[in-house]
Amino acid sequence: MNAVTEGRKVLLEIADLKVHFEIKDGKQWFWQPPKTLKAVDGVTLRLYEGETLGVVGESGCGKSTFARAIIGLVKATDGHVAWLGKELLGMKPDEWRAVRSDIQMIFQDPLASLNPRMTIGEIIAEPLRTYHPKMSRQEVRERVKAMMLKVGLLPNLINRYPHEFSGGQCQRIGIARALILEPKLIICDEPVSALDVSIQAQVVNLLQQLQREMGLSLIFIAHDLAVVKHISDRVLVMYLGHAVELGTYDEVYHNPLHPYTRALMSAVPIPDPDLEKNKTIQLLEGELPSPINPPSGCVFRTRCPIAGPECAKTRPVLEGSFRHSVSCLKVDPL
């Protein structure tokens, strides 16, 4: 346990989560079995009340699919996802309805996630009208205005349309829509990657402020390692659908154990120009393997500088302590 999670209850428990897609191309005969794309392949973790979990990894590693599988937007192939002790996988649509008021999502492209034919007042109010149909129009409007103020939008903009706002403002609208039901968990799927750097900082600071005020837990997915370090309590590193390292942000950033994590962290820019000039970047050789035909054993072994013969035979699993665990046969997690 760390200071953030000590004494707090487990909100989300994920065990051996897998998301596989069947792929059949035009070169296959109809009687041939389809190929399998392993987008997420056996991720296990716990998320605690009030915690922010950062998820990092290169494009195509399964970050977004992992997040969408949690909330049921993508169907999981196998594994377990429990919310407050209740199994989510296999739930019926009417059962999901109650859970989704507790778990909301903020999407990557702020403008594309908003209906262009609806005013922002209607967009933010839509979850309220869905879950509280008996709420009066006046009460809905007042709650929408209060939420707009909370995310930094002026209430007099309530009747405007999404195209009249900047990217940062559209993301604030998306945040307001996600928070209007007062959920316990927000899944942020690369919420700042489409924004300018200055706007990114504003959105991240807003999320942290709202987390303190509302007692939220966050799953924050991003490419920008500096942003993830700034906002996260713990960090999950993914590679080709696998969890390769998990730990507190301090351990993962300052004492990375997995060769892939070391390469990632070596690419983070250092503000001091003298240190930046003299640092060594660990370059990975070879191409990223296909998730349709991943390597046997450790999926990172084809690009790993310390891989041995045993890495082709045995698939490693996360081992270590709560503060720091790693999935590597060549590294001692303790």
Swiss-Prot record:
Record's function text: Part of the ABC transporter complex OppABCDF involved in the uptake of oligopeptides and of the ABC transporter complex MppA-OppBCDF involved in the uptake of the cell wall murein tripeptide L-alanyl-gamma-D-glutamyl-meso-diaminopimelate. Probably responsible for energy coupling to the transport system. Plays an important nutritional role and is involved in the recycling of cell wall peptides.
Binding site for ATP: G57, E58, S59, G60, C61, G62, K63, S64
Stored PANTHER family: D,D-DIPEPTIDE TRANSPORT ATP-BINDING PROTEIN DDPF-RELATED, TRANSPORT ATP-BINDING PROTEIN
Keyword entries, A-Z: ATP-binding, Cell inner membrane, Cell membrane, Membrane, Nucleotide-binding, Peptide transport, Protein transport, Translocase, Transport
Self-association and partners: The complex is composed of two ATP-binding proteins (OppD and OppF), two transmembrane proteins (OppB and OppC) and a solute-binding protein (OppA or MppA).
GO biological process, one term: peptidoglycan-associated peptide transport
Membrane topology qualifier: Peripheral membrane protein
CDD domains, per the entry: ABC_NikE_OppD_transporters
Family, as annotated: Belongs to the ABC transporter superfamily.
Reaction(s) catalysed by this chain's protein: a [peptide](out) + ATP + H2O = a [peptide](in) + ADP + phosphate + H(+); L-alanyl-gamma-D-glutamyl-meso-2,6-diaminopimelate(out) + ATP + H2O = L-alanyl-gamma-D-glutamyl-meso-2,6-diaminopimelate(in) + ADP + phosphate + H(+)
Gene Ontology CC entries for this record: ATP-binding cassette (ABC) transporter complex, substrate-binding subunit-containing; membrane; plasma membrane
Name by which UniProt lists this protein: Oligopeptide transport ATP-binding protein OppF
One Gene Ontology term of the molecular function aspect: ATP hydrolysis activity
EC identifiers of the protein: 7.4.2.6
Locations listed in the record: Cell inner membrane
Enzyme class: translocase
Organism: Escherichia coli (strain K12)
Domain ABC transporter residues, every copy: 12-265
Gene that specifies this protein: oppF
